[in-house]
Amino acid sequence: MALSPNYGWAEPDNSSLVKNGAQDIRALGDAIDTSVWNVGYGQAGKNKIINGDFGIWQRGTSFQLNLASSVALADRWQYLCDDGANIKTFSQQTFTPGTAPVAGYEGTYFMRIASATASATETYSLFTQYIENVRTFAGQTITISFWAKAAANTTMPSVAIRQNFGSGGSTAVDTSVTTNIAVTTSWQRFSYSVAVPSVSGKTIGANSYLRIGLFNPTQA
């Protein structure tokens, strides 16, 4: 048996005997089946975040949040807070060529979040993406990675996930991923792994989801 050049699948040699043909074909079929399964829905290696490079903004490229509610930003992304006194502006920014922080990948865009006023009463400030179906990654370990920097050194309170079981479903489950993230004035990559709780025994209703949340500094 030989190995395919890209995926390393076992495949018949040019000199394989006819009597080994069925065995060789089955080995190749099993290898392909395993590879496709591993990158399929909810399987290891599948990135479920959509528009993670902030390249798509169908509703515009700059938004302001001045109410204690939420605002839709780049496609699939949303921002939530509980105090509209802390006015925030969200905008698509373009990297100067050669300055993107990811080695080997010259990204084009990033998102900027700017606070215009301070708030003494804001208790949460959350940058998030909702992934349809609470079954997504249930019972598996996932990795959440992102790049961030700030105008001045600051601390992000936490990264967390929420499993919402939909209308009429079980009570939502919140799981902390990490806390007290030191963000500096230089781009840094942050990467954290977390075990997503099983949904065994839960009741799942309509419009369930898994939420990935990056909690931002409040009162600033």
For every predicted segment, state its role.
Residues I32-A220:
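Extracellular and organelle-lumenal recognition/adhesion modules and their flexible linkers in secreted
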Residues M1-W37:
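Extracellular "spike/adhesin" assembly and maturation modules
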